[in-house]
Amino acid sequence: MKHPLQEMMDKRREGIRCGIPSYCSANELVIEIALRRAKERNIPVLIEATANQVNQFGGYTGMKPADFYQMVLKMASAIGLPENMMILAGDHLGPLTWQKLPESEAMENSVELVYQYARAGFTKIHLDTSMKVADDPEGLLQTEVIARRGAKLYKAAMKGYEELKAEKPDAMRPVFVIGSEVPIPGGATEAEDTLAVT
């Protein structure tokens, strides 16, 4: 089965304009409204969680990735939205949350983070290794370092997915967003007076 985001990309290549909003919230009311909208319009719903909101230590919501997934799934079931209409995503997953730690610790946490997101069933994984950690040298982070860290996280995510697939053969393979060509986590750091499509 093809991922709904890949289906949309195929349509766009054919000149068919389409898209869906992304809801980056752990607020149950926001999630419920998003799920209801998806059911009413018969479109997939994309709900994103950040590493600060949801992680292996509970994040500020107190939820691990599997907890968040099950919460959304339970809400979707109550509304009557099938699981295959849900796209759960991890946003800016990587060492950002652990920037004050040295690379070995920050990456150990990051590997476990992306593993748990994929293992829980999240199917859109944004890997972002562009942020420095405590023992990175001054200046720009080298492309080789960013790529090495990203490859390590991709491998961890795929391990989580393969374990999920062994238990749930119809589990959808995740799609990946790599890098940080999107606004930085939390939004821009300077005033903006225009909107850039990313």
Residue ranges and their predicted role:
Residues 57-61, 80-88, 123-129, 159-164:
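Low-complexity, flexible helical/coil segments
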Residues 94-198:
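Helix-rich catalytic cores of soluble enzyme domains
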Residues 19-24, 45-49, 84-92, 123-129, ...:
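Hydrophobic faces of well-ordered beta-strands that scaffold small-molecule active sites
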Residues 1-86, 193:
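Alpha/beta catalytic barrel-like cores
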Residues 46, 71-101, 169-175:
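Glycine-rich, aromatic-flanked loop segments that form ligand/cofactor-binding clefts
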